[in-house]
A protein has these predicted regions:
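Membrane-proximal envelope and lipid/glycan-remodeling enzymes
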Residues: 1-529
Length: 529
């Protein structure tokens, strides 16, 4: 375990800083909760723009003491115990499925080589904690086959899975169904009552939470769900292509190689784990996959696959040696190339295919983008007042690090766009857009597309600026930008850089100003008129 922890830390250091804007959407809710404003987005926007309730609450805990500062760092701090839980859980799962102590330890070591798990941890998203809870829930369930005391742990772990991510109902529902069938199969009234006593409290908690969030936010499911609901309809092959690429390029198929052996050996725990892996992959195909460059949707099955592979290897080698076969040493070494290939495919630090290089490039791009958004937030804070309605497609960072009331353009954190929008001009795996919704949303500020902060002179006319506001052509069918908005800029004279924005006219003249930090806010094209 210590060796695996050391390798994981070394892997994190080698990968370096990883950030994704979507993580900061959840951080915005956590920050507001920590500051006593409730689980709302940006400045008082009541929308369920997160699908990770439990993680949102956990990240809020340390933010109470930092007064909302350093959300990414605090998320990593809160994620560290889940790294330990993941290592312990995959060890227990492998042991419960029949692996020897040594092979179970190998299973833990495999986790430390998985770059996607490292990236998931570094982003501060719920990904790794969710993976850890799923693994723990299955480890506790399989362990309960031999020790009934683990049933309560399994039940509450299943609830934690369902609260950690909205689609946690998939593993939790499968576990509930399995426990029910097991209890009914015994045809014992005592077993059925034990099942009800164990499971009922967790179901009550889940139903109470679900009803609360439905009442509080007003939608049956989070806006993130509605924002991406069109993906499987408009790109019906996207989910299959996503799963196929992850399974083949990441060599995840290696984990299922030994599953038939365990089924033949009648390992009930392995049957459950392998069945869930298949169900989970089918679910990901149905919802259309994901765009994030670290296999996020398939990661919950990775530790389970490692446990299956190590358990099958351990049992196979043990069987070969007990049979005292003449070629037992050769047969015992047969799984070694499989393990070597798996390590090469999951570790992206050294040898990479074009697919993996593309993902690493995507990670670097996302990290660079977030740094640019953070810098832009400092400029926008000079002009957008508290509660000002700012339209942006970078809702995470700007929702977390400005005090604007964000109109999030993808619908991830905007219920109006999520439920009424379409996909005009966008890919549905990112969300929706709704140009016709903007008169109702009453925007007050827009900003230019990346790079938001540019060296002067950046634009020569109002038309140049409008052409660099995302979706201004579509939104312009419903809002007269030239009549209702003026073009301004936040200038940093020391560096010669500026961020251009649109500000809604309210009848009063636009007056230039200078902040204590040396920023100048002016309206260059207004003064020329």
């Amino acid at each position: 375990m210590m060796a695996a922890a050391g390798l994981f830390v070394a892997h994190c250091i080698r990968i370096g800083d990883v950030t994704i804007d979507d993580a900061f959407i959840t951080f915005s809710f956590s920050k507001n909760l920590a500051l006593g404003h409730g689980p709302v987005f940006s400045h008082g926007v009541r929308v369920e723009g997160y699908s990770t309730f439990l993680w949102m609450v956990l990240v809020a805990l340390p933010l109470v003491f930092t007064r909302g500062a350093a959300p990414l760092g605090m998320a990593r701090v809160m994620g560290a115990p889940f790294v330990a839980l993941l290592g312990w859980s995959v060890y227990r799962l492998a042991r419960a499925c029949g692996a020897s102590r040594r092979m179970a330890a190998v299973c833990v070591l495999l986790l430390s080589f998985d770059t996607d798990l490292v990236v998931g941890y570094l982003t501060g998203m719920e990904t790794l904690p969710y993976v850890a809870l799923v693994t723990f829930a299955f480890a506790a369930t399989v362990q309960s086959f031999f020790d009934a005391r683990w049933q309560k742990w399994a039940a509450w772990a299943g609830l934690a899975v369902a609260l950690m991510r909205i689609d946690g109902f998939v593993p939790w529902g499968m576990l509930l169904g399995w426990w029910f069938l097991m209890a009914m199969g015994k045809r014992d009234a005592i077993e059925i009552k034990r099942f009800v006593r164990t499971v009922a409290p967790t179901v009550v908690v889940y139903v109470a939470w679900f009803l609360w969030r439905w009442h509080y936010y007003g939608l049956f499911l989070p806006s993130t769900y509605y924002a991406k609901a069109l993906l499987p309809k408009l790109l019906p092959n996207n989910g299959f292509e996503y799963v196929t690429a992850e399974v083949l390029e990441g060599a995840l198929w290696c984990g299922l190689v030994g599953w038939p052996w365990l089924l033949w050996r009648r390992r009930l725990g392995a049957a459950l784990v392998g069945l869930y892996v298949i169900v989970h992959w089918i679910y990901v195909v149905r919802v259309g996959g994901d765009w994030m460059p670290f296999g996020r949707f398939l990661l919950p099955t990775v530790p389970l696959l490692f446990a299956l592979l190590c358990s099958a290897t351990s049992d196979f080698v043990g069987t070969v040696f007990r049979a005292r076969h003449r070629l037992r040493w050769l047969l015992a070494l047969a799984p070694v190339p499989l393990f070597a290939w798996l390590v090469v495919r999951i570790d992206h630090r050294f040898v990479n295919s074009d697919f993996e290089k593309g993902r690493l490039s995507g990670i670097a791009d996302q990290t660079a983008n977030v740094k640019a958004y953070l810098r832009a937030a400092g400029f926008l804070n000079q002009v957008v007042p508290s509660g000002g309605r700012l339209v942006t497609d970078y809702g995470g960072v700007l929702g977390c690090f400005t005090d604007a009331s964000i109109i999030e353009m993808w619908g991830l954190a905007n219920a109006t766009i999520a439920t009424r929008g379409d996909t005009e001009g966008v890919r549905p795996n990112y969300g929706r857009t709704c140009a016709a919704c903007y008169p109702e949303l009453k925007p007050e500020y827009f900003h230019v597309m990346v790079p938001m902060v540019r060296r002067e002179p950046a634009f020569a006319s109002v038309d140049d600026v409008l052409a660099n506001v995302w979706q201004s052509d579509a939104i312009g069918r419903y809002i007269d930008f030239k009549r209702d908005f003026g073009v301004g800029r936040v200038l940093q004279p020391r560096t010669g850089e500026a961020l251009y924005f649109l500000r809604k006219r309210d009848g009063s003249p636009f007056t230039p100003s200078k902040s204590e930090r040396g920023f100048v806010v002016d309206y260059p094209f207004e003064t020329r008129q």
